[in-house]
Structures are given as C-alpha cells and as structure tokens.
Amino acid sequence: MFADNQMISGRQCARLLFFDFLGIGTLLLPGYLADVAGEDGIFAIAFGVAASLLYLKLLQKIVLGREETFLSGAGGGIAKAADGLLIALYGLYYVLLGGYALYLFGTLIQRTLLVEESFWLITLLGLVLAVYGMARGMESRARVYEVLFWLVLIPFLLMLLLAVADVSPQQQFPMATAAPGDVLQGAYLVFLVFSLCQMLLFAGNVISPEKAGRAAGSAILFAGLLFAVLYEILLGVFGRVTVSELEFPAVSLMSMVTLPGGFLHRQDALMVGVWFFTLFALICSSMYYSCQCMEKFRGKSVLWRGIPVKKWILLLCG
C-alpha cells in the first residue's frame, strides 16, 4: 500500500523533472543548436548545463532563505505586493508553457500518427487527459512516471545505440569554428530548457527544498548528457545543414533506424510514445503549478474551480 500524503520522494522529483526536460529538449534543441552553433553545439550544451546548475544553486538559496513557502506571501506592504506580482507572472508563464507544450503534443501526434485527424481534436483529447492527470495530484503522477521512467528511456537509448552504426565522424568536425557569440546563444537555448527547474520554487508542499535541489541537479546532469549524445549522433547521421532544416530531427532519426530482425516496420510510431509521455508530463506540470499560483489569490479550492477556465486558456494558447 502507498501512503497517500501528497508528498513525493527525491527520486520521483528527479524523474518528473527529467521528463519535463526530455520532451521539449530533444524535440527542439538539436535543430536550433545546429543552426546557431553547428559542430560546436556540444560546447553550447556543456555551457548551458553549467549555467543551469548555477541557476539551480541560486534558486536553492532563495527557497532555503525563506521562513515560509514561496507561495505563502510572507512579509507585508511592498514586499507582499512584489511577491504577489511575481507569482502572477509565474502563473502566466506556466499557462503559456503548457499551451506551447500542448501545441507541440498535437503537432507531433498529428504529423506522425494521426495524419487524417483534426489537430484541435487531438489537442482537446490530450488536454482532457492532462486535466485528469493533474487533478489526481502530484503524488499520483510521480508514482506513474516512476514506473514509466525505464519503460520510456530504455527504447530511446536502444534506438540511439542502433543509430550509432550510421554515424559519419567527418560530419561532426571540424569543431571550435563557431563564433563565441553563437556558442553562447546556443548555451542560452539549453539554459531555457533547464530553467524549468524553477518549478522547485512551488514544490515546497510536496517535497523539501533540500531534496528538490538534489533531484533537480541530477535531472539536469542526466538530461544534459543525453542531449549531448543525441546531438552528436544527429550530426553524424544527417550533418549540420540537414539537422538545422528538419522540424523534429530526433523523430526523423527514429524513423530511419532499423531494428534487428525487421519485425517492426513503424518503430518511429512506437518511439513517438517517448514524446507523448514527456510532453504530457510537461503539460500536467504546467497546469499544476499555474493552479498553485492561482491558489495564492483565490484559496485552496481554486485547484478545482480553475480547471475549466484552464482548459480553455491552454487550448487557446495551443
């Protein structure tokens, strides 16, 4: 039996954050990095990871330095008003983030699996599922993704391993040719993905700040390593120009990898499941934390009263 205390462990927190990073990062980063940094994209990833870890340390100091939770609105007067404004901005940020993740979710499913179906129908069904998942609470979602972690990750790693056979090392070189500004621009893009670790500001009600900080750090390092491996494989298989032109390079890579035995002809359809679960996790997280921000202004019952409004907001954003 599981304890129903709405608390999550450090491992569960790390896996939830990893899923949030993995979906949007593997879909978008390779093309952007190839466009701005080319063969030096690997350095941009390294710098982006380093900057994200420093940012995480700053967040930890902010959270640990407060006597109350970030959402409690400690203090009064100007301080309380500033807190309220900041939380409102974070709430808007999570609404927009959830809307964009929902857009990616619908676009990917339609273009790879359900070509004949309506984009709006796909996103609406995904949104209904996300609302249900969010309403079940953080602890329930954490349990689900703890179980799904290796079920999703092992096929992804297997496909990367099989893709190594098609890598042409000459397409990964020469390195150290991009302008420093281009590498820094790429690092900033990586940092934007990992800046999702700011969710720990609002996670004080489900996990201690110390555990959340360690979990976020491990998730950043693991995801950063995976981004680097994926990027180098994509460069070696497609080359810089092709990677920069493909809409979803990682999905294209999965579609061309052949499994031994040839018993599965549409393994790309199977691999879309990776992004189905990871983008779904990001949508649920965005909804959960935006509702946490709404609680600040409308009371605890907002988590339920805000759901119908949130559905329409996210749908419009998508």
What spans do the regions from the language model cover?
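Hydrophobic, membrane-embedded alpha-helices of multi-pass small-molecule transporters
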Residues: G10-L28, A44, G48, S52-Y55, ...
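Small-residue-rich segments of transmembrane alpha-helices in multi-pass membrane proteins
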Residues: I78-L89, L148-A163, F222-V229
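Membrane-interface loop-to-helix entry segments
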Residues: F105, W120-L121, G133-A163
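Helix-loop-helix connectors at the membrane interface of multi-pass transporters/channels
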Residues: L102-W120, S208-L226, S286-L316
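Short, Lys/Arg-rich, polar N-terminal cytosolic tail immediately upstream
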Residues: M1-I8
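Membrane helical hairpin/interfacial module
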Residues: G25-F119, V128
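Membrane-interface interhelical connector segments
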Residues: V237-D268
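Juxtamembrane helix-boundary/capping and inter-helix hinge elements in multi-pass membrane proteins
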Residues: G38-G41, E67-E68, I78-A82, N205-G213, ...
